[in-house]
């Protein structure tokens, strides 16, 4: 049961349930457009998975461990002596990570206040499509009413049915981000973005990391050229890859380690047993809708539990909208959720709102990084699209040579008839930054010649994007 702490005379125009990247951005944008807005977040800290236990803390650890690895592996070539003597204090590394996270979460709370968004710390559940009960973290219940509600509750890690998370030995991404000591042996089940990034963190600090993957290759949605380059680089940095078709058994031991028996793909599918003291399960994420009361209010979900939405983020129930990881549209990425939050708020304010799902980048923050947008070569072949390929390696790029970050390449795919850019795939130390130029080009329908004839600063790694585009419509100059 719920109780109203005060009479509701003036309902909110918009209540956003969830304060992650999609939710808090939607709330701020709605308020900026003149709508009376509230945001409800049960975590007690804004920013969602991304800021608290995802994108941001993982980047903090990736940065710290890259500096450590770089000191040991590369400093002497720059004439910086003594790098091999650098040590890592994991506790201090974790403290710095938390400092970054706390600063950003408090910053988001300030932004809500600045934009006059009412912030409720608690768990929201639908009583009716226009009434929400908020169970406050202070133990009090409060009913709030809204003309429109945006569901932005995000997602949570998926556990294997026979292997629940204990966050000590069997880890989700949350547990892997919080380790206080380096595992001697880590097995990562799932060779996607999360598994590869967090495997890299602990491999750089000396853990023996093995990534096992059900698909024929790690990061199976990437262009195959990109995957091959990435896997090769990770192996050189201490991560092994084992393809498998199944898991036959998992056995615990009394010394805090486990034995994992895998059915390995090659050599006739024989069983192989891997021992580890940390098992990271990164087999995907599932939408988080527990306690929302969607079923009793007849909000439609698909067979996997995602909220079904239409072209304007509307559910089948009037006044109820949904964005981000919880919906059945687009990749489960923070920046996708942010764009949906802006577009949904604009629509609720009576303005046009749109997300171009064909131009949403994906980045893996390993070293080298991988960034992709648009179609892969495999997708174009499958669709029967006539296309051209332009590639340029970073070992022919002046800036990359000067700073000894020569791994990788840029690959551009264009329509053979029109020269319009259909996909861009980058492997290099700064791929996540370089992809921005490709996004802008694709968003505005640019051709490879448009980019190839645009003057790029020298020496920069962005020149590799220009040269790859030149390879599509003419020839490269520097390779």
From Swiss-Prot:
Q: Which residues bind FAD?
A: 41-50, 59, 124, 153-155, 325, 332-335
Coiled coil stretches, renumbered: none
Give UniProt keywords alphabetically: Disulfide bond, FAD, Flavoprotein, NAD, Oxidoreductase, Redox-active center
Q: How is the cofactor bound?
A: Binds 1 FAD per subunit.
Which transformation does this protein catalyse, written as a reaction? N(6)-[(R)-dihydrolipoyl]-L-lysyl-[protein] + NAD(+) = N(6)-[(R)-lipoyl]-L-lysyl-[protein] + NADH + H(+)
Q: Which residues form the active site?
A: 458 (proton acceptor)
A Gene Ontology term for the protein's cellular component? cytoplasm
Q: Which cysteines are joined by disulfide bonds?
A: 50-55
UniProt-annotated binding residues for NAD(+): 190-197, 213, 247, 284
Which co-factor is required? FAD
Family annotation (Pfam families): Pyr_redox_2, Pyr_redox_dim
GO BP terms in the entry: 2-oxoglutarate metabolic process
Task: Give the enzyme's main class according to its UniProt record, as a single word.
Answer: oxidoreductase
* Entry's family note: Belongs to the class-I pyridine nucleotide-disulfide oxidoreductase family.
| Further details from the record | The active site is a redox-active disulfide bond.
**What's the protein name?**
Dihydrolipoyl dehydrogenase
Q: What is the lineage of its organism?
A: Eukaryota, Discoba, Euglenozoa, Kinetoplastea, Metakinetoplastina
């Amino acid at each position: 049961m719920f109780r109203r702490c005060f009479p509701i005379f003036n309902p909110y125009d918009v209540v956003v349930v969830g304060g992650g990247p999609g939710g808090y951005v939607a709330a701020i944008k709605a308020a900026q457009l003149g709508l009376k807005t509230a945001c409800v977040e049960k975590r007690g800290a804004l920013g969602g998975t991304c800021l608290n236990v995802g994108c941001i803390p993982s980047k903090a650890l990736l940065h710290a461990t890259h500096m450590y690895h770089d000191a040991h592996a590369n400093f002497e070539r720059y004439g910086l002596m003594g790098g091999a003597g650098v040590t890592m204090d994991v506790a201090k590394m974790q403290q710095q990570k938390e400092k970054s996270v706390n600063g950003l979460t408090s910053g988001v709370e300030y932004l809500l206040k600045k934009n006059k968004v009412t912030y409720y710390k608690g768990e929201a559940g639908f009583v009716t499509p226009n009434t929400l009960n908020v169970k406050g973290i202070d133990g009090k219940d409060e009913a709030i009413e809204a003309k429109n509600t945006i569901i932005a509750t995000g997602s949570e890690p998926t556990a294997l049915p026979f292997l629940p998370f204990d966050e000590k030995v069997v880890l989700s991404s949350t547990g892997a981000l919080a380790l206080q000591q380096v595992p001697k042996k880590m097995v990562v089940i799932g060779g996607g973005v999360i598994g590869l990034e967090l495997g890299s963190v602990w491999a750089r600090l000396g853990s023996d990391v093995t990534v096992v993957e059900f698909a024929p290759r790690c990061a199976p949605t990437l262009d195959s050229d990109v995957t091959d380059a990435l896997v090769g680089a990770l192996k050189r940095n201490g991560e092994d890859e084992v393809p498998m078709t199944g898991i036959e058994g998992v056995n615990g031991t009394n010394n805090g380690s486990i034995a994992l028996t895998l059915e390995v793909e090659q050599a006739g599918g024989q069983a192989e047993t891997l021992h580890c003291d940390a098992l990271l399960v990164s087999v995907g994420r599932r939408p988080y809708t527990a306690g929302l009361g969607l079923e009793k209010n007849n909000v439609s979900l698909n067979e996997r539990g995602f909220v079904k939405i239409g072209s304007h983020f509307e559910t089948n129930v009037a006044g109820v909208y949904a964005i981000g990881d919880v919906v059945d549209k687009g990749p489960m990425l923070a920046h996708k959720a942010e764009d949906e939050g802006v577009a949904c708020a604009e629509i609720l304010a009576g303005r046009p709102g749109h997300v171009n799902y064909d131009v949403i980048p994906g980045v893996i923050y390993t070293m080298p990084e991988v960034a992709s947008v648009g179609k892969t070569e495999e997708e174009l072949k499958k669709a029967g699209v006539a296309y051209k390929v332009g590639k340029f390696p970073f070992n022919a790029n002046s800036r990359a040579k000067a700073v000894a970050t020569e791994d990788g390449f840029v690959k551009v795919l264009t329509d053979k008839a029109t020269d319009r850019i259909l996909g861009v795939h980058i492997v290099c130390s700064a791929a996540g930054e370089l992809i921005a130029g490709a996004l802008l080009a694709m968003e505005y329908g640019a051709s490879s010649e448009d980019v190839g004839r645009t003057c790029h600063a020298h020496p920069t790694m962005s020149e590799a994007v220009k040269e790859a585009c030149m390879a599509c419509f003419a020839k490269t100059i520097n390779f």
